[in-house]
Amino acid sequence: MILAVDIGNTTTEIGYIKDLDKIETLKFKTDHGKTIDDWLINFSFFLNFYNLDETNINKIYISSVVPQVEEKITKALEKLLNVNPLLIGTDVKVPLKINYENPSEVGADRILNAFASINILNPPLIAIDFGTAVTFDVVNKNSEYDGGLIFPGLESSVNCLFSKTAKLPKVKIEKPSNIVGKNTISSIQSGIYNGYISLVEGVISKIEDEYKCKFNIILTGGHGKIISESLNLQHVFEQYLPIKGIYFLDKY
């Protein structure tokens, strides 16, 4: 059985994969202050929550964009399961040609999303991940990673607005009932939500104009589903895209 760990800037998702139809996950806060023992407790909770036999776990893969946390998690897993985790990008290379000026700059999460996507949809395609940052990752018709775009995430935008203004409140991100807000909270919610809908549709249109072809679109990430509900273009929402990427990588 495979244990997959996706360490993001805000949350760390732990998942076990029996097959593509059997994926179970839990998310924990990516806290730089957590100790090795704190992470050991998180992983033990995960195993107990799903009633998993730790002796059945024979492979562990880690995708990480937070090196400081990655080191602690690696040691916690070695201590708990007596298995050496494999770090994607270092111990395991993703079989994807990267057309980037400096390929080492591309985060493991972005490459993993791109690799997972070409196992789900036909290229050319765009994988869009709505996390702490919103990332667009472009795979060309030859299944090569061409690069992408990076924006502040929805939550990051709300936090910035709240911290940089005197009177604007911090609001929950949700789909507004009307485009025009009737109070401060609904105005911010509409601005964030509808602004990102327009951002996604506009950027995709510009990419398709530049490449002179249509792209398949796949969405993932914490706010991917709520954006998916109003996106006015054909697309797929895949909740477990990074975790499935690890599955496909293991089977490659």
Curated annotation (Swiss-Prot):
Residues forming the catalytic site: 109 (proton acceptor)
Cofactor: NH4(+); K(+)
Locations listed in the record: Cytoplasm
GO cellular component, one term: cytoplasm
Binding site for K(+): 129
UniProt-annotated binding residues for ATP: 6-13, 132
GO function terms (MF aspect): ATP binding; metal ion binding; pantothenate kinase activity
Residues at which substrate binds: 100, 107-110, 184
GO biological process: coenzyme A biosynthetic process
EC number: 2.7.1.33
Keywords: ATP-binding, Coenzyme A biosynthesis, Cytoplasm, Kinase, Metal-binding, Nucleotide-binding, Potassium, Transferase
Signal peptide interval: none
UniProt xrefs under InterPro entries: ATPase_NBD, Type_III_PanK
Family in the record: Belongs to the type III pantothenate kinase family.
Its job: Catalyzes the phosphorylation of pantothenate (Pan), the first step in CoA biosynthesis.
HAMAP family: Pantothen_kinase_3
Quaternary state and interactors: Homodimer.
Protein name: Type III pantothenate kinase
